[in-house]
Amino acid sequence: MIAILTDKPNVGKEIARILGAQTRENGYMTGNGYMVTWTFGNMLSLAMPKDYGIERPEREAFPLNPAPFKLMVKHVKTDTGWVPDINAVLQLKVIEKVFAACDTIIAATDASREGEMVFRYLYQYLDCHKPYRRLWISSLTDEAVLEGMANLKAGSLFNQMFLAADSRNKADWLLGLNASYAICQTTGTGNNSLGRVQTPVLAAIS
């Protein structure tokens, strides 16, 4: 059995249709030797300081520089604070089940740095060690999918693409968290936020 992972439900269902995986299950499609499942975009993110045992960073804690970085399930804000996204939690369990039931994996996430990061983060988070290959397509036509499946790429060919996305993500974390906590320490207020993108944009329009 071969697992296929996409980063959108509609993409997964379309690929499943093309490959003849027509049986619908909870969170995946199966049939013709395939189990096709999906994420809801990026369901994982870099962990927050409290996940490293730092509840309220003091001056001596700076700079925050985790080694290694940890991953966590995406959180959503509620009336009682930030909690794990239940949809992400449930779908991660489905993906783990699908991966466990298959011998090999095809990464069919978006053909981009972000798409590569979605798969690699999930692969790391689940501590998966099964062999995988990459489906690299820019169209969901039957012809494009079938051609891509006939010409699957070695996952290692996209290592540099993942490293680029991962480095950008970690740089955003380092800049955003350190700068935001630092300004909160300086001003004595807790509602300040700085970041690689938002700060120059706000400066440009102010």
Language-model-detected regions and their locations in the chain:
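Prokaryote-biased recognition of long, low-complexity C-terminal linker/tail segments
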Residues: T6, R168, D172-S206
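Intrinsically disordered, low-complexity regulatory segments
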Residues: M1-N169, W173-L175, P200
